[in-house]
């Protein structure tokens, strides 16, 4: 009986930690979308496990941005300065993405921002 109670506490703690991780990723996505749109992005997507709703405790945030004249390293630097430490992010410039990655972004991704033309 004590063993089951202990297991229940472990499961509850893991669920709480996972919920906190999902919330942290959601805040990062929202904040970074604000920053990228202010810089003039045409479109911002989230894709990967977060977009599919399959977040694990080790999941990172996969995002793509269209319409900015920055390399992936420059975009990650912008993200780091905007979000601070503890960054769990892969930020891809749409223009540099392979055809396969673009297909993945379009099929599983969610548009977080799209500039009105």
Regions found by a protein language model. Name each.
Residues 1-45, 52-57, 68-117:
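Catalytic core of pol beta-like nucleotidyltransferases
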């Amino acid at each position: 009986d004590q063993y089951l109670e202990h297991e229940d506490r472990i499961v509850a703690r893991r669920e709480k930690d996972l919920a906190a991780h999902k919330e942290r990723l959601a805040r990062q996505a929202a904040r970074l979308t604000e920053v990228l749109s202010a810089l003039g992005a045409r479109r911002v997507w989230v894709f990967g496990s977060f977009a599919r709703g399959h977040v694990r405790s080790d999941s990172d945030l996969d995002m793509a941005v269209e319409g900015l004249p920055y390399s992936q390293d420059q975009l990650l630097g912008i993200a780091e300065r905007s979000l601070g430490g503890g960054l769990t992010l892969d930020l891809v410039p749409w223009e540099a993405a392979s055809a396969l990655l673009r297909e993945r972004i379009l099929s599983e991704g969610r548009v977080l921002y799209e500039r009105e033309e």
